[in-house]
């Protein structure tokens, strides 16, 4: 969950407890996990990280400078866990509720000294060879100035089937790797929130996870990075209730992963984490301990 610190988790749990007529409690599926750990998120050059450096730390196991994607502070490419496992025969899926070329998902397949090199990062989807990508769209899909060939066309010309929305996904070419994009993200720089009038044609992250699992199949082991990216976006915008709803939406994906775990307990590992906390969220005191 991008930007999902302990404050955000506690708030979502508290909201769900209130809805259930309870005081306190662990309502989110991942709040009930048996193990909990905390970490420092400072980057190689700043006390306050950004998603690029933090995503790279998660993906590659090495701290780097803010704005760096999949490279060390000197700009040397790093190898992410996704590449390591792909080389070992795992199928790989990378998915998010924000643009697929945004910082955190990009850290698992991209290499760029600037997180804002969206166009070039998008083209690295092809280089990765990963079997499934999902997101709300592509930032700068025709380049920063809008004067380059559309990146989705480039991706399709180089071996992938780009599917806009569930209908195109169902009609996909099953012999090709897949990039799933929300219908509302067609030919635009996307921005969408679950509780802010999301398009009916769009799917939540749990449904995207289902799509990814369907593509990756069960004949080979697989690795999935599934990000609730809008948690961070809502927190940046000071939309507290939207932040809560995004966490609840993300938790539905965790619940689906748990169902898979229950079917394959000896070969499944689920890790829920955050690249950083966003917004310094604090649960306040109204004078009546509410």
Where are these regions (language model features)?
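Mobile, glycine-rich extracellular loop/lid and propeptide segments
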Residues: 1-11, 58, 63-64, 72, ...
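A post-motif C-terminal structural segment
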Residues: 4-10, 14-56, 102-290
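Short, contiguous strand/loop micro-motifs
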Residues: 67-69, 199
């Amino acid at each position: 969950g991008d930007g999902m610190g302990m404050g955000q988790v506690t708030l979502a749990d508290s909201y769900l407890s209130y809805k259930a007529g309870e005081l306190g409690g662990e309502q989110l599926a991942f709040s009930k996990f048996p193990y909990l750990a905390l970490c420092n998120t400072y980057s190689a050059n700043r006390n306050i990280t950004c998603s690029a450096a933090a995503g790279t730390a998660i993906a590659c196991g090495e701290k780097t400078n803010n704005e760096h994607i999949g490279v060390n502070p000197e700009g040397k490419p790093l190898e992410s866990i996704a590449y390591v496992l792909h080389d070992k025969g795992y199928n790989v899926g990378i998915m998010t509720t924000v643009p697929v070329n945004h910082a955190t998902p990009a850290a698992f397949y991209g290499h760029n000294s600037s997180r804002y090199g969206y166009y070039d990062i998008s083209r690295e989807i092809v280089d990765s060879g990963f079997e499934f990508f999902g997101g709300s769209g592509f930032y700068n899909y025709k380049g920063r100035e809008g004067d380059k060939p559309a990146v989705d066309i480039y991706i399709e010309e180089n071996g992938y089937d780009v599917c806009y929305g569930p209908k195109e996904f169902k009609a996909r070419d099953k012999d090709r790797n897949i990039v799933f994009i929300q219908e509302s993200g067609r030919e635009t720089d996307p921005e969408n929130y679950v509780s802010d009038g999301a398009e009916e044609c769009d799917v939540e992250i749990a449904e995207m996870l289902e799509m990814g699992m369907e593509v990756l199949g069960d004949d080979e082991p697989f690795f999935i990075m599934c990000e609730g990216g809008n948690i961070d976006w809502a927190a940046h915008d000071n939309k507290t209730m939207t932040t809560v709803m995004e966490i609840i939406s993300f938790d539905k994906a965790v619940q689906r992963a748990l169902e898979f775990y229950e079917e394959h307990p000896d070969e499944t590992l689920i890790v829920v984490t955050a690249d950083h906390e966003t917004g310094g969220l604090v649960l306040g005191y109204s004078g009546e301990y509410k």
